Amino acid sequence: MGSEKQYIDLYGSGRDALFSHSAAALNAVRDKAFDDFRRLGFPTRKVEKYKYTDMDAIFSPDYGLNLNRLDIPVNPYDVFRCDVPNLSTSLYFVVNDAFYSRLMPKSTLPEGVYVGSLNAYAAENPGFIADYYARIARTDTDAVTALNTMLAQDGLLVHVPRNVKVERAIQVINILRADVDLMVNRRVLIVLDEGAEARLLFCDHTADERRFLATQVTEVYVGANASLELYCMEETHHLNSRVSNVYIEQQADSRVSHNVITLHNGVTRNSLELALCGKGAECDVNGFVIADKEQHVDNNTLIDNRVSHCTSHELYKYVLDGRSVGAFAGKVLVREGAQKTVSDEVNRNLCATKEARMYTQPMLEIYADDVKCSHGSTVGQLNDAALFYMRQRGIPVKEARLLLEFAFINEVVDKITLEPLRDRLHYLVEKRFRGELCKCQGCSMCK
């Protein structure tokens, strides 16, 4: 047993605090999650799904935890002013793992829509939470999900009722703030009922240059004929470690666009498991990574086609500089009976230095015969001929490299349907390539 022991001991000593500061609906699954974690232990690199990231190195440091819910002084507006020009949003804050209710905006949301504390809602609506919480995020198959479930005390809940369309995008700023090294276990639950529509933008930032470990488990339920656009952007400092597991379940004729953007980080491992459970469901899964120095970014995806007539498109791109490490493992599973499945999966990667490393593993697993599925990946460097051509026309080599990298990543940026966000990301990507965001200096949306 490695780093698991400290968390097993922690649960034993902190169980009373966890239960006393959490709603009964969250506590109901806590002990089972602990039993599952103790049985599973952290996966090693011998486990295929985790072969590119050393989980023991992430979890072995001795982090503090705020189990007694001590107040952490912060005014989010003094730290970040996350403005995307021409994009009108309903703005919310999560500080570490707790929803920040002191700065609730004046409600511009349609009647019946809830955006707020998961723990507070669970205390008032235990039946609703019991229907969704820890259902698709199974603790018996993933140690990180089990660990998060046994330690999580709050987070965010978004619920959009049947046939309600939320016109204004919902923006959530996740802030890591502490005076000591801290572990944060955040939970997110998103439920869109039948025919509902919403757009969510999550921005992850660090307010202090402390060593943080953030685990986040997100469960997303998208009802029949519902539509969700989900954007997750990370810009944290180099001392930050982030392990995120996202689980999405789609019903018939639903549409999901899931976009992961890593502009700056320390060590990041993102996992996405998306299940197409109803006929006619469609998903568009995109991501891009810009990494340098010794940053590490690992994206692992599973698109599970459980029924017939579903469609999925997946595109991830990486630009790696310095001694950074990137990894992508994407699997498309087509189950028996899932005929007429259409799926394509593409991973393109650019290593700007000889020291940068990229590991890629796209996979298809098909048990139906009437399908259209493809997958592919490439790893390469900047085109020497293109560089030579541009230099012959008077473009300095540094500028030429920037233009080629910018053109490479823009294919993913252009898939973002929120036009103001897309325009802002074009600007941020250019700044990142110019080295202007070499460490987290606050919210880049305002710079």
Language-model segments: residues:
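N-terminal amphipathic, basic helical "cap/leader" segment at the start of enzyme domains
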Residues: M1-A146, L315, D321
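Conserved beta-strand/loop scaffold segments within soluble protein domains that form the structured core
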Residues: K106, E111-Y114, Y121-I395, I409, ...
